[in-house]
């Protein structure tokens, strides 16, 4: 199984990259984790968020293939626990070896992308800075992995 994280946004601060890299390193021996940073559409004060999301959707589609199992992070979807994420990872391992987790832009994810997603999950009803979500997802993937392996990290 390989997991790619597609993240729309500006280049994050150094501390975000360092935090993400720590969990990527911990997972690297068992689950390759790749972060692909995608630019957001240019915003203006009088612009249209729907058009921005449509532009971002076109960029997202260039990074997806038919064999990808697209999982989007969506605040309006079911909040899952770490244990539920571990169950999903177990399923992905056997059924969907190319997993792509999408972190949307500041205005959300275009409906055209939501329509092709295989799964929609939420990590919280709270709002987080998008760069921080990279670290949260990487850590939760690592934590879920340790649950599956019986490692004491989760306790």
From Swiss-Prot:
Catalyzed reaction equations: pseudouridine(1915) in 23S rRNA + S-adenosyl-L-methionine = N(3)-methylpseudouridine(1915) in 23S rRNA + S-adenosyl-L-homocysteine + H(+)
GO (cellular component) term, any one: cytoplasm
Gene3D superfamilies: 3.40.1280.10
Record InterPro entries: Alpha/beta_knot_MTases, RlmH-like, tRNA_m1G_MTases_N
Chain coiled-coil ranges: none
Keyword line: Cytoplasm, Methyltransferase, rRNA processing, S-adenosyl-L-methionine, Transferase
Keyword presence, rRNA processing: yes
UniProt-annotated location(s): Cytoplasm
EC number(s) stated in the UniProt entry for this protein: 2.1.1.177
Chief place where the protein resides: cytoplasm
Record: residues binding S-adenosyl-L-methionine: 73, 104, 123-128
UniProt entry tagged with the keyword Kinase: no
Family recorded in the similarity comment: Belongs to the RNA methyltransferase RlmH family.
Described purpose of this protein according to its UniProt entry: Specifically methylates the pseudouridine at position 1915 (m3Psi1915) in 23S rRNA.
Complex formation: Homodimer.
Protein name: Ribosomal RNA large subunit methyltransferase H
Source organism: Francisella philomiragia subsp. philomiragia (strain ATCC 25017 / CCUG 19701 / FSC 153 / O#319-036)
Primary gene name: rlmH
